[in-house]
Structures are given as structure tokens and as C-alpha cells.
From Swiss-Prot:
Residues 65-87 are annotated as: Disordered. Disulfide bonds: none annotated. SUPFAM superfamilies: Proteasome activator. This is Proteasome activator complex subunit 2. GO terms for biological process: antigen processing and presentation of exogenous antigen. Residues 72-87 have a biased composition (Basic and acidic residues). The keyword Acetylation applies. It comes from Mus musculus.
Length: 239
């Protein structure tokens, strides 16, 4: 019976892997000790900005440069008195909501950053999982629980990206309907409703981002010993 062979790496390849691991562990250390506390504070400051504390949502409305057609002639007009039916004037360039776009420019990078940090933490913990063998696996179970939670946060953050894309799609549809059926005022109102709903969603995103960072800080720092030293070795090390 053939013996299973181990992974054979050249000396140079092994060096490159070791450098990657060292950089990974250093990034994880910086993330936990420096980045996380600062990010929680910076998001708290962002939530105090005027742009995220708009009380009158009607002030968020962007002007819709969509011509309103003249009302139809009265039914009792004589056919000879009626003018030829005029074609509805076409719309020109319709920009997006500048206030929402400015807010999106602040929030989108924060969403991307948290997603990348989740990937960093996941990769870091995966590299700390010891060789599977009989013995005390309590620490490994904790690693798996933390990984499960970080993956859940990553999934929620990815849903934020979908929400942002959906805003443009739904608002675009509403604007298209308003420009096509210019006599239907409800379509114009729908555009404003989309903007107001998006504003509320963006503020909620920032609140959630801050909460996720706080959760990551708590769950990692509370279980750090078992994460970096799952087998209870004498000399635990993040590196």
C-alpha cells in the first residue's frame, strides 16, 4: 500500500509562503490593535455629520426636469375647435440625486473596506487552525465559531452592495416611467420615495458597519487566546 506523500515545496516557494504568513499575521495584529478601535470612532464621527442627520427628508429631493404636458381639451369642445394633438415634449439629460450620490461616495468605500477586513480575519484564523488530530479540540471549536460569525458579517456586507446597486436600478426605472408617462404624477413621487428610502438605508448601513466592527473587536479580543493558541501550547503566538 502506497504511503501518502506530503506537500513538497522548494526552498524558495517555502520562503514565499512564510513571508505571506508573516505579513498576514502582522496585518491581523494591526487590524485588531489599531484599525478596529479607530474605525469604530471614525464611523461614530461620521454618524454625527449633517449629511447623515437630515430630519426633513423632503429636502433630499432632486429636481426632475421632466416637462408636464398641457391638460387635455374639454370633452364638450367642438371637433373643429380642437387643435392637433401635440406630441409630449421629450426630456433632456436627467442627472441623479447629487445629495445621495455624495453620501454614497462616503458609504460605498466603507462597505468595501469591511468586506476586505472580513476576508483578512477569515484567512488569518484559517492559518491558525492546527493539524487535525485526537486531543483537546475545544480551541478549534472556538476558531470555527468565530469563523462562522465573521462569514455571517461578510454575507451581510455583501447584501449592502446589492442594496446599493438595486437603488440605481429602481430609481432608474422610476425616472424612466416618469419621463415616459409625464402626466402621471405618482411616478414623479415614486422617484422621491426611492431617494428618501435610500437615504434611510444608507444611514442604517453606517450604523450596522459600526456595530459589525464592534462585534468583531469583541468576539476576537474575547477569544484571542483560543484563536491563536487552540491547543493550549506553552508559547502561544499570533505569528
Amino acid at each position: 500500500m502506497a504511503k501518502p506523500c506530503g506537500v513538497r515545496l522548494s526552498g524558495e516557494a517555502r520562503k514565499q509562503v512564510d513571508v505571506f504568513r508573516q505579513n498576514l499575521f502582522q496585518e491581523a495584529d494591526d487590524f485588531l490593535c489599531t484599525f478596529l478601535p479607530r474605525k469604530i470612532i471614525s464611523l461614530s464621527q461620521l454618524l454625527q455629520e449633517d449629511s447623515l442627520n437630515v430630519a426633513d427628508l423632503s429636502s433630499l429631493r432632486a429636481p426632475l426636469d421632466i416637462p408636464i404636458p398641457d391638460p387635455p381639451p374639454k370633452d364638450d369642445e367642438m371637433e373643429t375647435d380642437k387643435q392637433e394633438k401635440k406630441e409630449v415634449p421629450k426630456c433632456g439629460y436627467l442627472p441623479g440625486n447629487e445629495k445621495l450620490l455624495a453620501l454614497l461616495a462616503l458609504v460605498k468605500p466603507e462597505v468595501w473596506t469591511l468586506k476586505e477586513k472580513c476576508i483578512l480575519v477569515i484567512t488569518w484564523i484559517q492559518h491558525l487552525i492546527p493539524k487535525i488530530e485526537d486531543g483537546n479540540d475545544f480551541g478549534v471549536a472556538i476558531q470555527e465559531k468565530v469563523l462562522e460569525r465573521v462569514n455571517a458579517v461578510k454575507t451581510k456586507v455583501e447584501a449592502f452592495q446589492t442594496t446599493i446597486s438595486k437603488y440605481f436600478s429602481e430609481r432608474g426605472d422610476a425616472v424612466a416611467k416618469a419621463s415616459k408617462d409625464t402626466h402621471v404624477m405618482d411616478y414623479r413621487a415614486l422617484v422621491h420615495e426611492r431617494d428618501e428610502a435610500a437615504y434611510g438605508a444608507l444611514r442604517a448601513m453606517v450604523l450596522d458597519l459600526r456595530a459589525f466592527y464592534a462585534e468583531l473587536y469583541h468576539i476576537i479580543s474575547s477569544n484571542l487566546e483560543k484563536i491563536v493558541n487552540p491547543k493550549g501550547e506553552e508559547k502561544p503566538s499570533m505569528y
